[in-house]
């Protein structure tokens, strides 16, 4: 096996983000703004007309403003990529990056919002109070288990779509890949044994979706930095991990991968060795998805 390295240096990555204009986002008007009349319509006094209309019916914001095609990408920087809690400001390049992906591939306008708080209730309150500004919210890089609580509450309290990308985006892609890989290797989902490295938002969501698709609960061994999530374990457990605890004598990722058909990596670089891969079932399915560097 060879390790795939990026085709750029650190300096090139920094130059990309700083030149010729710092960052990756800008705002472009959708109206010509070429004459005094345009300016009077865009701002005062013309803007008062849609203001009054929206005051009568707030749903008209979808007709008279950019709300319907505008998503907020929101983070507090407590779980940036696989790098950990580096703070809200450090998350900004990632959030800008997600925003430009929305624009490039779906023509959805987006803005990054960094919230400088680690308090769950404060974060919920802040996002709830500004959330209706946009047509949807993409939560990103918020630590587990707080991210589950935040998403659940915001879905209940806001009248717009709320999507936690680290959970659902990762799970959807991983599940789709697993279905295809099983078809290619002649496996049935109900029969595969799965080892998952990483019990954060992405790992738990992947486990939940593949279980929903037909992988047996007892065939999913989830591991975190403490080891296998097994029934009776008390160290570093919470209600979300407990939902995936199984009866097993295995206690380490090495043991979990022994004989496994599938490995889903959502942890850190270097977590898996060649020997661990060799111990898996023949023709193993390996998704090493640690970010920014894979497990192997």
Name each region found by the language model.
Residues 157-171, 288-291:
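Short, acidic/small-residue loops that bind anionic groups at enzyme active sites
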Residues 72, 112-114, 136-138, 195-196, ...:
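Structured core elements
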Residues 1-162:
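N-terminal ligand-binding/catalytic initiation module
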Residues 138-141, 165, 264-296:
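ADP-ribose/adenylate-binding Rossmann-like module
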Residues 159-160, 217-218, 281-285:
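A short helix->loop->beta-strand "cap" motif at the edges of active sites that frequently abuts
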Residues 131, 189, 256-257, 277-280:
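A short, aliphatic-rich alpha-helical micro-motif
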Residues 59-64, 127, 184-185, 209-212, ...:
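A generic local secondary-structure boundary/capping motif
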Residues 81, 86-106, 164, 172-264:
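Glycine-rich phosphate/diphosphate-binding loop of Rossmann-like nucleotide-binding domains
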